[in-house]
Amino acid sequence: FLAARRVGTGGRVIGVDMTIEMINKARGNAERVEAKNVEFRLGEIEHLPLADATADVVISNCVVNLSTDKPSVFAEAFRVLKPGGRVAISDVVAMKAIPHELTESLLAVAGCVGGAAQLTDVERMLTEVGFEDVRVTPRPESREVIAGWMPGTSAEDYVTSATIEATKPGGDCCEPTCCA
């Protein structure tokens, strides 16, 4: 609901989740905090239930690593963004090759480790779909937290939390309200 506060009463936030349980939970939370400018849609990150060029910002928190089709995730974000729109993602990325025992472990995949893409691959995928100003910023302070996810696996030696940002080209608006 941080996004709902950020866009103010004139803005609108659309939350997407692939499970009806999370949609219902989000709707209940929205009612509880009296958020009037939010709506929730059932959908997958690889097939967003939004029209082309309708969003100013696409935000995702620790979901991309769970997708088996990461290029489609980034292509969908590009599709739904207006020209000049931005992606802001917090996710787990690999800093080096992840051992097979972690990429094949259901616990590691569910724990956001096994499906993490290499940092350089994330940059490449974003650029290939057309994004500009691509920045993937590792967060080394996440090491201790990641170590606690799967004790004894050394997962923290392979992955880190990262902030992923990029811009869809074409936004030439000079007004202070554009994509704010």
Where in the sequence are the language-model features?
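Conserved SAM-binding loop of SAM-dependent methyltransferases across substrates and taxa
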Residues: 1-9
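A short glycine-rich, Lys/Arg-flanked "PGG" loop and its adjoining helix->strand segment in the class I
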Residues: 4-5, 71-86
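Conserved SAM/SAH-binding beta-strand->alpha-helix loop
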Residues: 19-21
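Conserved SAM-binding loop
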Residues: 26-27
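A short acidic, Gly/Pro-enriched loop at the edge of an enzyme's catalytic core
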Residues: 35-36, 46-58
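A short SAM/SAH-binding and catalytic strip from SAM-dependent methyltransferases
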Residues: 56-69
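Short, glycine-/aromatic-enriched active-site segment of Class I SAM-dependent methyltransferases
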Residues: 93-113
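C-terminal lobe and adjacent flexible extensions of AdoMet/dcAdoMet transferase-like proteins
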Residues: 125-180
